[in-house]
Amino acid sequence: MSGILLFIGIILLVIAIHDFFFTTLSGSGTGFVSRNISILSDKIIQVCVKVFGQKTYNYNGLFVNLMILFSWLLLIWGGLFLVFSSNPEAITNSSGKVANFWERLYFTSYTLSTLGMGDFTPSTAIFKMLTGAFSFFGFIFFTSSMTYFLSVASALVNKRTLSKSIYHLGKTPREIAKNILNFDSSFTYQQISELQNLIDKHAVNHHAYPVVHFYRQSKKRDSFSINIARLDEAISILLYAEEENKYREELKVLRSSLSDFLEDMEKNFASNLLIQKNAENSYSFPTLHSKDDEKELQKRRNIVQGLFGSENYTWDDIFNKS
């Protein structure tokens, strides 16, 4: 028995299984493997965008998800294959002949797929138990993966609903601010409350299923980063305007929800965002006298600019109708 193959196989299995269950069941983000595969996949998409254009973003989330699934399969398949290969006589065919390299690879694949053809069998009690355990794991793997992807799809629907809600509220920050003030008061209160609920829900989904971050769209009007930036700037206009408005307290609560989301973005997606230290000053606010307020506003603009900058947008896209 080859101890090196056995050791490497076990290490690969432990890494893959931990990453799989942490990502799909913990609701606390992604494992080390999934996180790095996501970052790498996104960088590949960014290269493709330069070659094929913005339409490539329509495949961003799909590509990241498939790459994560492929990495899990590859690690588990490879790890189990190495464990079986650690003992050349572990797997035999129906005639008792020892399986060769390709036959062990085939046996590993149909063990994980729970196919159970029966033309190859493990020869020892330990490998029989191992085969049974990973046949059961294969069933859990595919059902848990589908459940996870359904949860991601639900989170994606909420993200796009939020983006659409902001877009229909106004096409520029000033238009959003103007509409909030000019709408019927009961409708405005309702809109602020609904936006807060959608943002809070998206923040929770974003933390539980970080892959949602990578689902982008090619059209500017549908871009989540564009619309969330416009909303944040609109709230800044309303909160730092010289004129008082009756929605100030409600807007502060909405602002707080946005702040939590932006902080999570900065903490967990800094490598995917083009965050700069000094974002462009889009507006000057006469009532913004506090240094702390200036720093807070600059910080959130840096994060927001990093968000839409990662999709090759600029502040001009935020302030111009699309």
Can you say where each PLM-predicted feature lies in the sequence?
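Pore domain of cation channels
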Residues: 5, 9-20, 72, 77-81, ...
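Short, non-transmembrane cytosolic segments of multipass membrane proteins
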Residues: 13-38, 231
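Membrane-interacting alpha-helical segments
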Residues: 18, 34-45, 102, 106, ...
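Membrane-interface amphipathic/juxtamembrane segments adjacent to transmembrane helices
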Residues: 27-51, 161-171
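Cytosolic juxtamembrane amphipathic/interface segments immediately preceding
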Residues: 47-65, 119
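Transmembrane alpha-helical segments and their cytosolic interface motifs
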Residues: 60-79, 224-228
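Non-transmembrane accessory domains of multi-pass membrane transporters/channels
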Residues: 158-227
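Soluble C-terminal extramembrane regulatory/interaction domains of multi-pass membrane proteins
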Residues: 178-180, 191-195, 213-216, 220-322
